Design a protein with these regions (language model features):
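ATP-dependent carboxylate-amine ligase
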Residues: 1-152
């Protein structure tokens, strides 16, 4: 513990508020956003989905999954596995962002670019939702989140 009192450690952990697109919680209008768009790979996305799905109301949660990069020959299979996992977990509302997710077999909404989602949300934003957002850094999914109205 390096001589740091337990109470001080607890206070530091409890007061930590991420602001770097890594597991960042924020209010955007009437929505609560969980933004984890700094980096993603199949294992981190799977773990995040498995953690979020049982805790968030399926009817009130919108999942936004952005393409996972640098997977080489495994890319197609990995993206299909993520979509299959989403369905297995009972995820009802999702937007898949990027050409790799668009190529999968899925029942969800799909857009090719983050800017397409940002434009759609600027015209017709979701409301009163929990919005889970995760994808590779290069997808810049925070641009879509930024299109949502700020909290008044």
């Amino acid at each position: 513990h390096f001589g740091v009192p337990a109470a001080q450690i607890r206070e530091a952990i409890e007061s930590y508020a991420p602001d770097n697109s890594r597991s960042q919680w924020m209010a955007k209008g009437s929505n609560q956003v969980i933004l984890d768009a700094y980096n993603a790979n199949p294992s981190s996305m799977s773990a995040s989905l498995r953690n979020a799905a049982p805790r968030l109301n399926a009817d009130e949660t919108l999942y936004v999954a952005g393409d996972l990069f640098e997977l080489g020959d495994y890319a197609e299979q990995a993206h299909q596995e993520m979509v299959d996992l989403m369905q297995e977990l009972g995820i009802v509302h999702a937007v898949l962002v990027g050409p790799l997710f668009a190529a999968t077999k899925h029942p969800y909404t799909s857009v090719l670019r983050t800017d397409d989602l940002a434009e759609a949300w600027s015209q017709d934003p979701p409301s009163c939702r929990s919005i889970w957002v995760k994808g590779s850094r290069g997808m810049a999914l925070e641009r879509a989140v930024n299109a949502l109205a700020p909290t008044a």
